[in-house]
């Protein structure tokens, strides 16, 4: 019997094929004369629209009715749909989650029992662009967790977002993505499972997708070059060097060409080649570091081609001048430490700026075609004439010793101000890390701070750009430096760095090893200095700030460079409606507001405003923040604040 039924079914199918197949718009059994009018669209907003249609001579066999829509013509039920169950004479659906400024094609449909969908004629509509007020009203703050220790491991890397970021470098590529590259450091050394110089990317600087390591193995040239130098120095080769992969910089050179300059440290003692630890100390300094080069035509591929050595650590001492009397001696063998590169193109000339601790920051000219030094390097010892044609010319230093706490230069040019800027990391990275800034009208210097002092002479640069801090209802952040500074091509500038949890945060194992990537907005003062916002960037719609919004309580933090390792806390500053400051450090002062430039002047200090996320609020929400500088009796202070009431 079953076989007979199947045979009969095949015959029916064959007959129907001979008579001609049915289209989606043709009626099936039990539908009668049911038809659909073309849909009408109303109440169109940037994210929604209402679509209605009339069903003529509706059939009782209808099991569902609705609307299908797409950004492509002739949508079907395989595209997006909004529907209801059962029969009726009308269809009315509100489409939500639409994209702004987009054309949508829409058809009404009904589905009768055991029949294909019947479609109406097609209608189209265009959503308008959302107003800033609409965007702000609908804004949802980022939800990712800062304490990522529960998913810090390699297996959970799809959840990282900005977790496990250290020493970031950010470039905006031709495909519209921002690509972030970094040091290998990670909580629990998770990155060891996936190569070196790790990459992630984002379209909005808020949501980041991890792509993986850009280098799977240390290039052979590093060991070869290391032991070549050791042979010239009369030293035995190191067969198994201990490597550290640190602080790359990535720049777009031109369409189809991106360069990464990366740092590889050899963490072995010079004399014996033993790994660097206190037990192995052999009265010598540790080995030299190297800066190498990789290139790619497509950052999205995450495939980079290594181009070899660019430069290495160099010394003004003799090749055998590496003796170190004790671990407490800081008269370093190397003059320039070849890590922490940054790269800038200036009118067709290319420059590499690098350096960490030791004697300061160096600048060397690069061949635009090869990406390697323009002039041939000599031996990296016994150097007496430091120029951009050798291992580099000294352009900035923190003091005059051979072991000074400054590193991580980042050099950019702002055409709006006409200045080049050099950002530097001061102090040790775990806690006291803080950022300073210099500027120059020439990429070759002189680089001066806000006091006009030339950094080549060895200065304590002012002002402080970022510093360990703490708003209420949080543990705050420390180790905020070694930054990337970049713009989006539309005049908006950003600062990115790692930040760490403070030591001994309750409930967090090894809390100071929790490193999170931060991205912050930069504004530029009327005098052409960058101020970095105190709260992280969250793509908050920048609705113009009205004066009335400024009245109330603010958490204010005042920072300076005179408190090594201190995490600055906040105090309340209250602005009254009659333009008086009624609480806080500036109590008794007055305030005014320049709405055109979004600058609050409080007690005579100009504070630059921005809408940002209040990351300490629960749940996170939007607020207004400020940043500025002022000179207080010869001490430059950095003023950060956020509106809380």
Regions found by a protein language model. Give the residues of each.
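C-terminal motif of bacterial Sec signal peptides marking the signal peptidase cleavage site
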Residues: 18-21
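Bacterial N-terminal signal peptides that target proteins for export
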Residues: 1-11
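Short, surface-exposed linear motifs at loops/turns and structural transition points
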Residues: 23-130
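Residue-level signal for mature regions of secreted extracellular proteins and peptides
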Residues: 15-16, 584
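Carbohydrate-active catalytic/glycan-binding domains of CAZyme proteins
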Residues: 26-27, 129-645
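N-terminal processing/targeting junctions
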Residues: 13-15, 104, 112, 174, ...
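N-terminal non-cleavable signal-anchor helices
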Residues: 13-14, 78, 254
